[in-house]
Amino acid sequence: IFIPGLLQTPEFARARVDAERTLGPVDYSADRAAAGRLGRQRMLRRPDGPTYHVVIDELAIRRATAPPEVLRAQLLHMAATVNGSPKMTAQVLPVTASIEAYGTPRSAFSIYTFADPGDPTVVTVDTVTDDLLLTEVEDVRRYADLFGRLRQAAMPTEESIELLIEIARDLAVRS
């Protein structure tokens, strides 16, 4: 359902916070959240930065989650950010994809591994109000297995970039 924060433009992030405000007060600043994401995005682009692999549900890029011009710019930003990057991949999971054992996530999640082998792999699971932090080996293994299945069922990065651009063009025509 979501476009990952590390790939969000400031305008898209603000639009999402504005949408959240319709459900009730939020206790954070959209501008500060966007600035933090931009800082983390810069870390991704550093030569010594981390690798980043993301699988995005096709519905997340097709659903009207922001005004059309904001969503269009968001999709083009994602395509440009990932295109040609040796350390980033973005794969779109088509709605028609067949996932091994029909395993689908119940919500968005992230897996963090660290260069230091002494640091444990950590999984965060997104909820409406907070992120759950999982460190138990079996929990982490299950999410790693699920992520592998999602990557296998998703489109290759090149095709995913083409789809992002195609949907952005369609938004321009409809706007």
What are these regions (language model features)?
Residues 1-175:
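Hydrophobic protein-protein interaction segments
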